[in-house]
């Protein structure tokens, strides 16, 4: 899977990295700091298909970041924590293709420091629940069979009922997750697209059907689940495709148990949009005109976005999703 594996030299003899390297079975290349090489020169995003390198490093600087408005449900503070850079999947709309200078993966291993910062943040908000989201810069489950950090974050939730951790994912890699007990404040949230859309643009990801099967398995075992319909992309038979997706979820009794469902229409920064045009010139992402929007992102016009999200919201309500659990993600007046 990996072309080369780089490890920061001060981490080589640590137990966590030794365990990780034994699973990878790859001779590491030592370096002082991962950013001596990573991102120093432009590596085209699609080169990940042939030569994907792995860097194992210590995350320095800010370990938690305050999430922007409309990132999660309103009323409580939301942060995201950075456990990795880049993703093994290849979704045509992914903003990472214009965010970093390289698609190579970085896995950060200083989870105890991240958890300490979480604890400090929790103490700074003594009367509130505080949300911590994983999956902003990398899928939160895809490589957990290698990294083995889930138990640490699970224990943090067990010991801190006011903390809510959300693992955002498109993965069906739940091997490590199934070793843990369900907790109400340890939420696994799945990004889902209608089957036709997923096949067209969620490249190298588990299918929508596979994700639904995993959600069903986790639900049967009592795990807390949520879903993201984000990005919502317009295409012919748009309404029918979301009806079919929600019916599939309803058949598995998933719609009524969701902690929440977020709805967000496809959007890009200007730089990411240029990369998408370059990397996927024939994508259905380009089939509907977009404009520069309220936050300088490239999106469909406002009436169209509202119509799309309200259409999907009505379908979700009909399928049994709780109205107070549905919110609009990264949208004005959300």
Question: What are the residue ranges of the model-derived segments?
Answer:
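Structural preference for beta-strand elements that scaffold enzyme active sites
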Residues: 4, 129-133, 164-166, 185-189, ...
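Active-site glycine- and acidic-residue-rich loops that bind
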Residues: 166-167, 234-247
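Auxiliary Fe-S-binding modules of radical SAM enzymes
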Residues: 1-17, 247-334
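Flexible, acidic/Gly-rich N-terminal and inter-domain linker regions that tether
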Residues: 1-77
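Cysteine-centered iron-sulfur cluster-binding motifs in ferredoxin-type domains/subunits
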Residues: 81-91
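Conserved Radical SAM active-site core
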Residues: 57-77, 92, 96-189
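Conserved radical SAM core fold
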Residues: 138-141, 172-175, 186-206, 231-235, ...
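Structured alpha-helical segments in the cores of large, soluble enzyme domains
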Residues: 118-124, 176-181, 208-221, 312
């Amino acid at each position: 899977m990996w072309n080369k594996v780089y490890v920061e030299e001060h981490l080589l003899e640590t137990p966590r990295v030794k365990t990780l390297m034994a699973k990878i079975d790859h001779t590491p290349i030592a370096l002082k700091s991962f950013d001596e090489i990573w991102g120093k020169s432009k590596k085209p995003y699609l080169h990940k298909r042939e030569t994907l390198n792995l860097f194992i490093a210590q995350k320095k600087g800010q370990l938690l970041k305050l999430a922007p408005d409309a990132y999660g449900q309103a009323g409580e503070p939301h942060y995201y924590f950075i456990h990795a850079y880049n993703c093994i999947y290849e979704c045509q709309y992914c903003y990472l293709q214009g965010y970093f200078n390289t698609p190579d993966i970085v896995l950060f291993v200083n989870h105890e420091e991240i958890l300490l910062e979480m604890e400090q943040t929790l103490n700074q908000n003594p009367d509130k629940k505080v949300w911590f989201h994983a999956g902003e810069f990398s899928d939160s489950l895809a490589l957990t069979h290698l990294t083995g950090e889930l138990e640490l974050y699970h224990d943090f939730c067990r010991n801190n009922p006011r903390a809510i951790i959300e693992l955002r994912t498109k993965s069906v890699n739940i091997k490590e997750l199934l070793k843990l007990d369900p907790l109400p404040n340890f939420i696994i949230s799945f990004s889902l697209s209608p089957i036709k859309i997923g096949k067209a643009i969620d490249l190298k990801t588990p299918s929508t059907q596979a994700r639904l099967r995993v959600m069903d398995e986790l639900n049967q075992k009592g795990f807390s689940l949520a879903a993201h319909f984000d990005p919502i992309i317009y295409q012919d038979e748009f309404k029918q495709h979301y009806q079919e997706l929600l019916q599939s979820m309803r058949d598995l009794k998933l719609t009524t148990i969701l902690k929440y469902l977020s709805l967000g229409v496809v959007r890009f920064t200007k730089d990411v949009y240029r990369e998408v045009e370059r990397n996927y010139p024939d994508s259905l992402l380009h089939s509907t005109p977009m404009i520069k929007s309220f936050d300088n992102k490239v999106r469909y016009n406002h009436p169209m976005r509202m119509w799309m999200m309200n259409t999907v919201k009505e379908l979700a309500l009909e399928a049994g999703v709780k109205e107070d659990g549905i919110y609009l993600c990264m949208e004005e007046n959300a």
